[in-house]
Amino acid sequence: MANENTRIFLVADGLEAMERAVMSLARIGIDSVEGVLAKGIEGWRDQGLPIESIATTSAAETAIWMQLGRVQVLDVRDEYEWNEKHIPGAMHRYVGHLESDLPLLPRDSEIVVHCNVGHRSGVAASILKRNGFTRVHNMLGGLSAWEKLGLPLDGPGQSRKAD
C-alpha cells in the first residue's frame, strides 16, 4: 500500500481527472505525485510502450473452476467481512497485509482474487503480479456477483447450498 515514501505516478484521461486524483491523494496525506501520464493508457499504447494487464473472470466461471479443483480463491476483504460471510474453500488474506503474506500463498496454482465488488481485489491482483505470481485473475463483481448468482457461502446465518 502507498505511504509517504511511495513514488506516485498518475494515469489520467485529461486535466480534470488528474486534478481529482491529486486532490483525493492529498486528502489521505499523499502529496508527492512524481509524474502524470496525461493522455491515459491510450496515449501510452499509441507510443508503442508495453502494457501489463490482469486477467478477469466471472463469479460463475470461478465456481466452475472451484468444482474442477482448478483454482485457489483468495478473499482480500477485511477480517470482519470474511467472518460475516465468505466463499467456501477460499483463503483469506487482507489486502493491506498481502505483501507480508506472500510466502503463504500457493505459487503453483491459478489464483482468483476477490473482494466485495472488485476494487480491492484489483489492487491485490496487481500486488501478486508485481511479485511474480503469473496465474492471477480478478473476479469481476466480487462477492456481490457471487451472491447474486445464489452460489454457496459460509459464515454465521449463511445457509450453504448443496454442491
Can you describe what each PLM-predicted range is?
Residues 1-72, 76-163:
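Rhodanese-like catalytic fold shared by cysteine-dependent sulfurtransferases
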